[in-house]
Amino acid sequence: MFKIKQVADLKWNYILSSHRLKLMHWSTLAISTCIIFSIIANIRAPDFIRILFYLLSGFLIYKLHLKLKHLRYEADYYLILRESLLYVLHTNRLYTTYKDSSGYEKIIRSATLEYELDRQKGHVLIKALITGDEFSKKVQSLDDVLAGVLELELDEKIIRPSFVEYHFFYKKPERLVLQSHNQKQEIDNLDINLGYGVIFNPIKCPHILVSGGTGSGKSIFISVLILEFFKRKSTIYIADPKNSDLGSLSHYLGDKYVATTPNNIARIVRLVVEEMQERYQYMRDNFQYGSNFADHGFKPVWLLVDELGAFQASAGTDKKSKETIVEVMDGIKQIILLGRQAGIFILVSAQQMRAETLNTDLRDNLGLRIALGANSNEGYRMVFGSATPDKLKPIEEKGAGYLYMQGSGKETAQYWESPYLDTAQFDFIKELQLYLTETN
């Protein structure tokens, strides 16, 4: 098939357009029909033979129509997109004209918009070139114009030295729907599908921060992660100072792995830090260049700290209580900074991730950051920092929010919907019990 130049520039004269392609389609069919039927009409043969030829010709013409329609369908995406971008350039006067001696006006310079189309993902990428001319400033602020002409919501905008990227999706990513299983699943790799095209791997992107108020779906999402961790033979420790949903899991995991009081929380943090130190000692004694915990046969260990702010507030003001807080926060700091290579990971959750709860330097070392539910601009900044998007869409679905994953290629947090779990159909405790015989 012919290749369509994926550039919109008003200086160029484009031979092919969606309208011309449509004319070519129907003209080809009309001419082919006339030629074939004329030939059949001049054939000297019995009438029933000619009727058979007419029927066969009609079938062939129909097949030709389908083939041309398919080719046109494939090309129309690119042509209509190019024509839309040319319309943007023209109506926003992103060009310079020159009148020759006869008074004829000619475009001598134009802003240039390149585009790429990924039909499998439903993704449109538009690159507005920055060339240092008078249009370079204007092409950096085409957000609303492009969104309007494409009738799509802008997903992400990235300003690079020589061009501006505008990302759009015309296919909504699929939200993951969890299904019940009657038997235990064992997964060897650490990739976790979070839906919406997000694959999380703690080795590549260590540690998780989850922020969300009451009714945001935070507890359900953490429950989903607990099952995913168990499927990968992880050991899980839970600190829940509010003794709420996660704290109640002590009935199934045991008090060794679930803590709700300050002293017990300090105990499990100490256990995790000691495990990390022992692993590092083992890896030093059995040194392999470039290796990590998995190369030495270790499985992941996860420390889940729910409502970190509540823990800091729950301890008393006496000296011993303060020492407990300092010990726990120091252990959390060690895990965040040193845990990845040893396979020790942490998930920190809070209703609001204030700097007093976790300082920004440590927050930025949490590779996967999620803010569930509606939030204020300040609330998003406390979670995402410099990765907070300029424009935020309203959160209308329970379990929806914004997600930022380091190393994903995204410069800002993206709208995301957490895996859907129908509590009426999905028995979390029953699923959990499948994994309690050989883990924890």
Which role does the model predict for each range below?
Residues 137-144, 349-440:
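Conserved ATP-driven motor cores of ASCE-family P-loop NTPases powering translocation/secretion/packaging/pilus
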Residues 238, 243-249, 354-360:
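Short, glycine/polar-rich helix-capping loops at beta-to-alpha or helix-loop-helix junctions
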Residues 146, 210, 240, 272, ...:
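Residue-level signature of catalytic and energy-coupling elements of molecular machines
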Residues 268-276, 323-347, 375:
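Substrate-engagement module of ASCE P-loop NTPases
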Residues 244, 310-314, 338, 354-355:
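Residues immediately C-terminal
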